[in-house]
C-alpha cells in the first residue's frame, strides 16, 4: 500500500512538539509524501496556541518543499454535546479538522458519555475525522459511532503512534476492533503519524499493516492518493483548493 498523505502532525506551536512546519515539510518531501496536514493542538490543550493561530494559517503557502500543505487542527472534544474548542469563525480557515479526546480537557467518563460526545461531534458537521479513537481510556459503542461516521462522511483515523505502545497504551486492541468493524460498515479510513518531531513524519508502518491485515479496500483509505484525499474533502462539502488543481 502506498500512502501519500499524513493527516496528523504537530509543530512547535503545540507546546510539546519539537519541529517547525518547514522541517516537517522537508521531512515529508524526503519520505515521498505529496500532501501534509498540519494539525496543531487547539487552545484548550495545555501549551496550545490561541485560536488566532489557526485562523492565520491562511498566510501559509500551499506548497512547502514541493509538498502540498493542508491547514488543519486537532480540536478537543469538550463535552457530551460534542462541542470543540474553536469558534465557528475558525471553520472557514481550516481544510482539515480532527476531533480527539484528551485527558487534560475531557476527563474519562462512562462509555455512554463518550459515545454521546462522539455522535454529537460527528453530527455537528464541524469535523472531518475522529482522532486516535482507540484510546482505552475512552471506551465507546464502536458500531453506533462508526455507523454515524459513515452516514456523515467523517473519516476514522488509524493513528500510528497509538499502535507503538508508547502513547495511549492498550490502544492496539481497540484499534484492531475499530478497523474490523469499520470494514464491515464501510467507513472511510485515514492514516496519521501523530508526529511530534519531524523525523516521525510519514511513520505509518503500523497503521498500514493494520489496514492490510483486514484487507481494507484502497478506495476506503483516503490517504492512498492525493485525488482520494482531496475528493473526500469535496464530499465533506469543502471548497476545491485552486492551488491543488492538478492533484484532484
From Swiss-Prot:
<feature type="binding site">
    <location>
        <position position="74"/>
    </location>
    <ligand>
        <name>Zn(2+) 1</name>
    </ligand>
</feature>
<comment type="similarity">
    <text>Belongs to the PHP family.</text>
</comment>
<dbReference type="InterPro" id="IPR003141">
    <property type="entry name" value="Pol/His_phosphatase_N"/>
</dbReference>
<feature type="binding site">
    <location>
        <position position="102"/>
    </location>
    <ligand>
        <name>Zn(2+) 3</name>
    </ligand>
</feature>
<dbReference type="Pfam" id="PF02811">
    <property type="entry name" value="PHP"/>
</dbReference>
<dbReference type="InterPro" id="IPR004013">
    <property type="entry name" value="PHP_dom"/>
</dbReference>
<dbReference type="GO" id="GO:0071978">
    <property type="term" value="P:bacterial-type flagellum-dependent swarming motility"/>
</dbReference>
<feature type="binding site">
    <location>
        <position position="194"/>
    </location>
    <ligand>
        <name>Zn(2+) 1</name>
    </ligand>
</feature>
<feature type="binding site">
    <location>
        <position position="10"/>
    </location>
    <ligand>
        <name>Zn(2+) 1</name>
    </ligand>
</feature>
<feature type="binding site">
    <location>
        <position position="16"/>
    </location>
    <ligand>
        <name>Zn(2+) 2</name>
    </ligand>
</feature>
<feature type="binding site">
    <location>
        <position position="74"/>
    </location>
    <ligand>
        <name>Zn(2+) 3</name>
    </ligand>
</feature>
<keyword id="KW-0862">Zinc</keyword>
<dbReference type="InterPro" id="IPR050243">
    <property type="entry name" value="PHP_phosphatase"/>
</dbReference>
<dbReference type="GO" id="GO:0016791">
    <property type="term" value="F:phosphatase activity"/>
</dbReference>
<feature type="binding site">
    <location>
        <position position="41"/>
    </location>
    <ligand>
        <name>Zn(2+) 2</name>
    </ligand>
</feature>
<feature type="binding site">
    <location>
        <position position="132"/>
    </location>
    <ligand>
        <name>Zn(2+) 3</name>
    </ligand>
</feature>
<dbReference type="InterPro" id="IPR016195">
    <property type="entry name" value="Pol/histidinol_Pase-like"/>
</dbReference>
<dbReference type="GO" id="GO:0008270">
    <property type="term" value="F:zinc ion binding"/>
</dbReference>
<keyword id="KW-0378">Hydrolase</keyword>
<dbReference type="InterPro" id="IPR023710">
    <property type="entry name" value="Phosphatase_YcdX_put"/>
</dbReference>
<feature type="binding site">
    <location>
        <position position="8"/>
    </location>
    <ligand>
        <name>Zn(2+) 1</name>
    </ligand>
</feature>
<keyword id="KW-0479">Metal-binding</keyword>
<dbReference type="GO" id="GO:0005829">
    <property type="term" value="C:cytosol"/>
</dbReference>
<protein>
    <recommendedName>
        <fullName>Probable phosphatase VFMJ11_A0091</fullName>
        <ecNumber>3.1.3.-</ecNumber>
    </recommendedName>
</protein>
<feature type="binding site">
    <location>
        <position position="196"/>
    </location>
    <ligand>
        <name>Zn(2+) 2</name>
    </ligand>
</feature>
Amino acid at each position: 500500500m502506498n500512502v501519500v498523505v499524513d493527516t496528523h502532525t504537530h509543530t512547535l506551536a503545540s507546546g510539546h512538539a519539537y519541529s517547525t512546519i518547514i522541517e516537517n515539510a522537508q521531512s515529508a518531501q524526503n519520505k515521498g509524501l505529496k500532501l501534509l496536514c498540519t494539525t496543531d493542538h487547539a487552545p484548550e490543550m495545555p501549551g496550545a496556541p490561541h485560536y488566532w493561530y489557526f485562523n492565520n494559517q491562511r498566510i501559509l503557502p500551499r506548497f512547502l518543499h514541493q509538498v502540498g500543505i493542508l491547514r488543519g487542527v486537532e480540536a478537543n472534544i469538550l463535552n457530551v454535546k460534542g462541542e470543540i474548542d474553536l469558534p465557528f469563525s475558525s471553520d472557514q480557515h481550516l481544510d482539515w479538522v480532527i476531533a480527539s479526546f484528551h485527558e487534560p480537557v475531557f476527563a474519562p467518563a462512562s462509555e455512554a458519555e463518550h459515545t454521546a460526545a462522539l455522535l454529537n461531534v460527528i453530527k455537528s458537521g464541524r469535523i472531518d475525522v475522529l482522532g486516535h479513537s482507540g484510546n482505552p481510556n475512552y471506551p465507546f459503542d464502536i458500531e453506533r459511532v462508526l455507523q454515524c461516521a459513515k452516514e456523515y462522511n467523517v473519516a476514522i483515523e488509524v493513528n500510528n503512534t497509538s499502535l507503538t505502545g508508547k502513547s495511549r497504551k492498550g490502544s492496539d486492541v481497540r484499534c484492531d476492533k475499530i478497523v474490523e468493524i469499520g470494514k464491515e460498515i464501510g467507513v472511510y479510513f485515514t492514516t496519521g503519524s501523530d508526529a511530534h518531531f519531524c523525523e516521525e513524519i510519514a511513520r505509518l508502518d503500523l497503521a498500514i499493516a493494520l489496514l492490510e491485515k483486514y484487507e481494507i479496500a484502497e478506495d476506503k483509505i483516503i490517504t492512498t492518493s492525493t485525488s482520494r484525499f482531496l475528493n473526500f474533502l469535496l464530499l465533506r462539502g469543502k471548497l476545491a483548493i485552486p492551488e491543488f488543481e492538478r492533484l484532484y
